[in-house]
Amino acid sequence: MAFGKSHRDPYATSVGHLIEKATFAGVQTEDWGQFMHICDIINTTQDGPKDAVKALKKRISKNYNHKEIQLTLSLIDMCVQNCGPSFQSLIVKKEFVKENLVKLLNPRYNLPLDIQNRILNFIKTWSQGFPGGVDVSEVKEVYLDLVKKGVQFPPSEAEAETARQETAQISSNPPTSVPTAPALSSVIAPKNSTVTLVPEQIGKLHSELDMVKMNVRVMSAILMENTPGSENHEDIELLQKLYKTGREMQERIMDLLVVVENEDVTVELIQVNEDLNNAILGYERFTRNQQRILEQNKNQKEATNTTSEPSAPSQDLLDLSPSPRMPRATLGELNTMNNQLSGLNFSLPSSDVTNNLKPSLHPQMNLLALENTEIPPFAQRTSQNLTSSHAYDNFLEHSNSVFLQPVSLQTIAAAPSNQSLPPLPSNHPAMTKSDLQPPNYYEVMEFDPLAPAVTTEAIYEEIDAHQHKGAQNDGD
């Protein structure tokens, strides 16, 4: 089984393996040919920039070997100058600059002064930008943070050469006049160049920085006095103007931090920029809270309007008003109908009774208008039982109900008996032909309101035979 390096090892890639060999401590001096070969691989492969940066991180991370660190810095310098934006954009990230290069400045690594100055020079030069639109905001942030901590950056070789030329020119031709101090907006030099301010320029710069400080104090006071949702209109207008001016001044301060060489001026610029940035962040937070409160008020207003309006038109709602009452006949109409029906021995109920009655199940039949009608006991009991049931006023008029007609029955006292009568035999005396009178029967109508059939069945019970038998016994 062959043992090899893991794919997670940065040295396992082709470019990583070359970087490991070129920066090994056993190498006597920089192999520039090998360095150029590494640059070619970075430029010609898709994963070359990423793999190269990973290998460089591993070489300088927690490395106490000064020889390997020096060789690695030389390789980094050559790759930055000869590789494209894909490599440059990775090398200027905070992850590489702050987590690897800046940590080498820790005293525990005990780096020589020339190596420390080389690292600081890298950070300062990269913060000034690259051609091709490479984002250097992260390395610039690291640079400003180091300046704020009081780290002194050495002048670059170009700056040292320019300073020597200016010194020689001043010594040969002393100036006859003092240049006018430019404003803050004019103390901006082109990229990859620095500016050495004269005392007049420094004084002018301090006066403009004082104006920026005053604007910051005014912005802070307005933000403290106003509350989102109940702010003063005039204060908000002034705050917007100060915010716009502060944004412009912040951009100029950032440009000055890159080109100005005076350490005292740089420290003051950093402090003013920090105060201005806090004021700008406070204004943006105030604006967000203001927008949120406006949206909440708008939503509450819409919710109030929604609850105050009916959810549906009134014509679509259920009509719970009482139903219209049935038309009633007047007293004159009742008298006229009584006169017309007098010949039929019918009479209409009085107006008082009519007013207290509900509409009957079948309005076309007025059962209460019958007079002198003999109602059998069975029908009376049935009517008493039915009165306790519910009356359905809305029963359909075209129902196929069969109405029971009252039947006149003879009232004959019968002997009380608790048992049902047995059927008469065929040879019973009451069934003989000599009997002249036919037997009398009670006609009992059996009515079941829940039965599905529409016909009724009559049950006949012979009573006369019982009576004849009793009379015959008495005669004997």
Swiss-Prot record:
The modification Phosphoserine is found at S171, S314, S321, S323. Pfam families: GAT, VHS. GO terms for cellular component: cytoplasm; cytosol; endosome; endosome membrane; extracellular exosome; Golgi stack; lysosome; membrane. The lineage of its organism: Eukaryota, Metazoa, Chordata, Craniata, Vertebrata. GO terms for molecular function: clathrin binding; phosphatidylinositol binding; protein kinase activator activity; protein kinase binding; SH3 domain binding; ubiquitin binding. This is TOM1-like protein 1. It comes from Homo sapiens. Probable adapter protein involved in signaling pathways. Interacts with the SH2 and SH3 domains of various signaling proteins when it is phosphorylated. May promote FYN activation, possibly by disrupting intramolecular SH3-dependent interactions. It is a peripheral membrane protein. Its main location: Golgi. Phosphorylated on tyrosines by FYN and LYN.
